[in-house]
From Swiss-Prot:
Subunit structure: Monomer. Interacts with SLC19A2; interaction is required for the phospholipid scramblase activity.
Organism: Homo sapiens (Human)
Protein name: Mechanosensitive cation channel TMEM63B
Region listing for Intracellular linker IL2, in residue ranges: 231-426
Molecular function (Gene Ontology), one example: mechanosensitive monoatomic ion channel activity
Subcellular location: Cell membrane; Endoplasmic reticulum membrane; Lysosome membrane; Early endosome membrane
Length: 832
């Protein structure tokens, strides 16, 4: 089908003498492609750079004035980690009976303590600029986790790749394009820099095809080099734990242990944790602690000032300046005391019901990786036999009651990677929810794919008529590319919330879904449809299913290679480099949510709670997708319009610096699996493949499908696609793959480890490394005699990190100067 289509396109293309009028009319009226001086690039570059400087100045001001945005939550989190580490070190020290030297442990404690987000090296007006360069990768690893280091390493390899591509494109391909004489001999013509300046029979076109294949090889080599240095660490606990779905809902942990130990004689089950529906329990626990913090806050305030505080308990109550019926003020301590008591009762009732809400899932931890792999292979082999010779897993006396024939067994994700509150959403409900959300998302993006649909709608009301004939680069290039950037910046936020409401079980799954959906929509929005002169997906489908498809297709594909078409994408990359990265520093979506939550707070105590809990994890999925969209645009046009590559390199350099700052200062660490990073590598490889597609279409339009350059490009493209499909679907051609990971195992919870010369203790395992929801771990030490469901009861008591925060006085959270700034801010809030 593809060769027939290309051959038809080549035949009809030769008969279409001048498709420019059609392509221009398909654009934003007649104001986007008009043969401006060098495509309007100098004007757009100057405007975007001035906007960039203005946004940096605004960020520096906001950083000094609203310094608590994105910082108090990080300080609170660092302080919580520091207290948790200190308690763990003390428990280990006592339990080990003074065995060995504790230097290494206290060195880790110092590392955590030193990662407070506000330090003395960036407390000036613009000193944060130099602080970005002084942050080391080891500091980022300690504070932000290994995923942040992998992400930044990925960016550095992309930068290196763009440096090589830029040298080849600007140093060789650009002079070759200049050597043509097909277009007018004008020094200010942007078209002279493009491949459209070469005649169809020029032998220099072989150079472009060869360079496209070379870029593909360079991309694969760069990604293999990145993945070979990635050294992805997998915790030993994760490799020894299986996640079982489809288990009998009322199966007990002892019965699960008995099954595996009977079925596998050499197997020792260390722990079996059934899963329960804890979504409402987690909600009540969070609300209870908020109320307790509010009561503690106003109790401390009254002890200082000896004056009771009155509050309006309605949302936005602190903004209401008039007392009307239904919005009367109440005494703060009394209100929060009643609210806390009510929530405590609801919490206890819900906790008693948790045992009655099993999910039919369990996490089972074994004594070593070998037996874990054997059990996993046993279940998966049986499942893969189909209806012909389906076998049963190894039986035991408990097989029938546990329904082992219905089990789905896989490796468990990291405990920090799990959304415990989402485990209860599954089966038909989850799929229906996912379908509805994605249908709504598709309908929304169906009509708002590009800014062209907005401007063409404005044209119907003659809004742009007065400026249509000005032929000004500000009108024709700056605003369309700015609009395109605004929509492409809004799309990741929309896609992220769609993935969030899908209720994925793991953070990695949520990020992967966001990355793939966002990348697909962005490529359609930013690259494919604007390149083809299509203003939205509705026109795309009308064109695709029209009876005159083949006749119109040639004209559509000619739109890709108009002389000034590349200028639109050059200007888009410039806007992304300067305005996009500056807006990433400001974090406008997060700032808006922060302001809304502050406005909805009912008192100063709740505003303080908002400030302490408004920092979020870095969204690797959306970040990868947006970055790969710009990279794909750059690589796709790197040969047909080589002037775009230096601006793509500028974008990646600024993006790298901005992300280093945000990861270290503005976001909480995230724990993901390697699939999110491998998915980004696959998207990188897609970029040079699209470049080959572009060259194939150009050669087919100019010389026909049977021309030598067209046939060579087609063969290379087919071989590349076949290799990619065989590798992705069947695992072949591993040596030609862009993936070259090396896995390292971290011994976090082995059978007989020794830490610093001391024997291990139960206290050495942090709570986050247990396959049980945090709210159930807290329940183990509530003191009311109720243990967490599925717990063995032999674990030593340890206080909840969040409950510790409640019992600490406000002035004892940390001993840093930054915390004293927080206290003074809160006091100023109180007296306002």
């Amino acid at each position: 089908m593809l060769p027939f289509l290309l051959a038809t396109l080549g035949t009809t293309a030769l008969n279409n003498s001048n498709p420019k009028d059609y392509c221009y009319s398909a654009r934003i009226r007649s104001t986007v492609l008009q043969g401006l001086p060098f495509g309007g690039v100098p004007t757009v570059l100057a405007l975007d750079f001035m906007c960039f400087l203005a946004l940096l100045f605004l960020f520096s001001i906001l950083r000094k004035v609203a310094w608590d945005y994105g910082r108090l939550a990080l300080v609170t989190d660092a302080d919580r980690l520091r207290r948790q580490e200190r308690d763990r070190v003390e428990q280990e020290y006592v339990a080990s009976a003074m065995h060995g030297d504790s230097h290494d442990r206290y060195e880790r404690l110092t590392s955590v303590s030193s990662s407070v987000d506000f330090d003395q090296r960036d407390n000036g007006f613009c000193s944060w600029l130099t602080a970005i360069f002084r942050i080391k990768d080891d500091e980022i690893r300690d504070k932000c986790g290994g995923d942040a280091v992998h992400y930044l390493s990925f960016q550095r390899h992309i930068i290196g790749l763009l440096v090589v591509v830029g040298v080849l494109s600007v140093g060789i391909v650009l002079p070759v394009n200049f050597s043509g004489d097909l277009l007018e001999n004008n020094a200010y013509s942007f078209g002279r820099t493009t491949i459209a300046n070469l005649k169809s029979g020029n032998n220099l076109l072989w150079l472009h095809t060869s360079f496209a294949f070379l870029y593909l090889l360079l991309t694969v080599y760069s990604m293999r080099r990145h993945t070979s240095k990635m050294r992805y660490k997998e915790d030993d606990l994760v490799k020894r734990t299986l996640f079982i779905n489809g288990i009998s809902k009322y199966a007990e942990s002892e019965k699960i242990k008995k099954h595996f130990e009977e079925a596998y004689p050499n197997c020792t089950v260390l722990e079996a944790r059934p899963c329960y529906n804890v979504a409402r329990l987690m909600f009540l626990d969070a609300e209870r602690k908020k109320a307790e913090r509010g009561k503690l806050y106003f109790t401390n305030l009254q002890s200082k000032e000896n004056v009771p505080t009155m509050i309006n308990p309605k949302p936005c109550g602190h903004l209401c300046c008039c007392v009307v019926r239904g919005c009367e003020q109440v005494e703060a301590i009394e209100y929060y005391t009643k609210l806390e008591q009510k929530l405590k009762e609801d919490y206890k009732r819900e906790k008693e019901k948790v045992n009655e809400k099993p999910l039919g899932m369990a996490f089972v931890t074994f004594h070593n990786e070998t037996i874990t792999a054997i059990i996993l292979k046993d279940f998966n082999v049986c499942k893969c036999q189909g209806c012909t010779c389906r076998g049963e897993p190894r039986p035991s006396s408990c097989s029938e009651s546990l329904h082992i024939s219905n089990w789905t067994v896989s490796y468990a994700p990291d405990p920090q990677n799990i959304y415990w509150e989402h485990l209860s959403i599954r089966g038909f409900i989850w799929w229906l929810r996912c379908l509805v959300i994605n249908v709504v998302l598709f309908i929304l993006l169906f009509f708002l794919t590009t800014p062209a649909i907005i401007i063409t709608t404005m044209d119907k009301f003659n809004v742009t008529k007065p400026v249509e004939y000005l032929n000004n680069p500000i009108i024709t290039q700056f605003f369309p590319t700015l609009l395109l950037w605004c929509f492409s910046a809004l799309l990741p936020t929309i896609v992220y919330y769609s993935a969030f409401f899908e209720a994925h079980w793991t953070r990695s799954g949520e990020n992967r879904t966001t990355m793939h959906k966002c990348y697909t929509f962005l490529i359609f929005m930013v690259l494919l449809l604007p390149s083809l002169g299509l203003s939205s997906l509705d026109l795309f489908f009308r064109w695709l299913f029209d009876k005159k498809f083949l006749a119109e297709a040639a004209i559509r594909f000619e739109c890709v290679f108009l002389p000034d078409n590349g200028a639109f994408f050059v200007n888009y990359v410039i806007a992304s480099a300067f305005i996009g990265n500056a807006m990433d520093l400001l974090r406008i979506p997060g700032l808006l949510m922060y302001m809304i939550r502050l406005c909805l707070a009912r008192s100063a105590a709740e505003r303080r709670n908002v400030k302490r809990h408004q920092a979020y994890e870095f969204q690797f999925g959306a970040a990868y997708a947006w970055m790969m969209c710009v990279f794909t645009v750059v690589m796709t046009y790197s040969i047909t319009c080589p002037i775009i590559v230096p601006f793509g390199l500028m974008y990646m350099l600024l993006k790298h610096l901005v992300d280093r700052y945000n990861l270290y200062y503005a976001y909480l660490p995230a724990k993901l699996d390697k699939k999110i990073h491998s998915g980004a590598v696959n998207q990188v490889v897609a970029a040079p493949i699209l470049c080959l597609f572009w060259l194939l279409f150009f050669s087919t339009m100019r010389t026909g499908f049977l021309a030598p350059t067209s046939m060579f490009t087609f063969v290379v493209l087919v071989i590349t696609i076949v290799i990619c499909l065989c590798h992705v679907c069947f695992g072949h051609f591993k040596y030609l793959s862009a993936h070259n990971y090396k896995i390292e195992h971290t011994e976090t919870d082995t059978v007989d480890p020794r830490s610093n010369g001391r024997p291990p203790t139960a206290a050495a395992v942090p709570k986050s490394a247990k396959y049980i929801a945090q709210v159930l771990q807290d329940s183990e030490v509530d003191g009311d005699g109720d243990g967490a469901p599925g717990s063995s009861g032999d674990e030593p008591p340890s206080s909840s990190s969040q409950d510790e925060e409640l019992l600490m006085p406000p002035d004892a959270l940390t001993d840093t100067d930054f915390q004293s700034c927080e206290d003074s801010l809160i006091e100023n809030e109180i007296h306002q």
